[in-house]
């Protein structure tokens, strides 16, 4: 049990050190940096993936993009991309980190958005057209509300991936919670490694809970009940 006692000892040392709660390297600032990187990457991914997924799902054209995107999600070496973009763009800005994170985030959102729209009951689509709605109106008023649970699920999966993977931002000299892990290993400060790792896990759990709450608020009870029946 020595490893367990060491774990809690390092954890207590990390969170009990006053210097870790203030200044540019303090926990609040590192959390804010991590949030900024993650939120920017996720927002860009949503702006790219949701419209494309809606368009492909509604028209049925360009489905090969979804297939390629799904396979890409499994094959992307995030750290390799990070190194490549650092070499191409340098470390003077946050974009060498943001671009790989966006590329990592797009596939789950794109695939789930597409699947959500294509999975809507054809009778609902026909009924919407029968009521006189046009293509864009059918999409926004009839299809999107039904597909919303899957779309939000894609966003949640991407958000958790981004929060966890933003740790690699520390490799470029940028901030975020990954600084504790990377710097801790470099200096054999295992209290920082353990504390930073716990913070990253907790951050990911909070993000997951927030998205679950958002889904409960945004999705109509009728759609939720229908999915439970399925």
Locate the predicted segments by residue:
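Glycine-rich helix-loop "coupling/hinge" segments at transmembrane-helix boundaries
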Residues: 87-88, 165-194, 198-200, 219, ...
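Cytoplasmic-entry segments and transmembrane alpha-helices of multi-pass inner-membrane transporters
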Residues: 52-85, 101, 111-115
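Short cytoplasmic-facing helical segments at TM-TM junctions of multi-pass membrane proteins
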Residues: 112, 116-151, 177, 181
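Periplasmic/extracellular loop-to-transmembrane helix junction in inner-membrane transport proteins
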Residues: 1-42
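C-terminal transmembrane helix and the adjacent membrane-cytosol boundary/short C-terminal tail
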Residues: 60, 115-118, 122, 195-230
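Transmembrane alpha-helices
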Residues: 39, 135-168, 195, 200, ...
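Loop-to-helix entry region at the N-terminal start of transmembrane alpha-helices
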Residues: 29-37, 86-108, 147-149, 192, ...
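Membrane-embedded alpha-helices of multi-pass transport/permease systems
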Residues: 47-52, 96-125, 148, 155-167, ...
């Amino acid at each position: 049990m020595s490893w367990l006692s060491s774990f809690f000892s390092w954890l207590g040392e990390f969170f009990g050190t006053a210097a870790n709660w203030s200044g540019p390297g303090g926990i609040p600032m590192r959390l804010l940096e991590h949030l900024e990187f993650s939120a920017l990457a996720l927002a860009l991914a949503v702006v790219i993936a949701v419209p494309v997924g809606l368009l492909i799902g509604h028209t049925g054209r360009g489905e090969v993009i979804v297939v390629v995107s799904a396979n890409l999600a499994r094959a992307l070496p995030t750290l390799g991309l990070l190194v490549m973009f650092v070499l191409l763009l340098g470390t003077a800005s946050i974009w060498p980190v943001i671009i790989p994170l966006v590329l990592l985030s797009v596939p789950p959102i794109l695939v789930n958005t597409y699947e959500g729209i294509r999975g809507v009951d054809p009778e609902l689509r026909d009924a919407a057209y029968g009521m006189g709605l046009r293509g864009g109106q059918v999409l926004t008023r009839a299809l999107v509300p039904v597909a919303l649970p899957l779309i939000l699920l894609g966003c949640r999966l991407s958000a958790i991936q981004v929060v966890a993977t933003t740790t690699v931002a520390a490799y470029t000299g940028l901030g975020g919670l990954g600084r504790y892990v990377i710097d801790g290993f470099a200096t054999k400060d295992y209290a920082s490694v353990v504390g930073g790792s716990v913070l990253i896990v907790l951050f990911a759990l909070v993000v997951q809970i927030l998205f679950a709450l958002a889904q409960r608020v945004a999705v109509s009870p009728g759609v939720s009940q229908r999915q439970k029946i399925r």
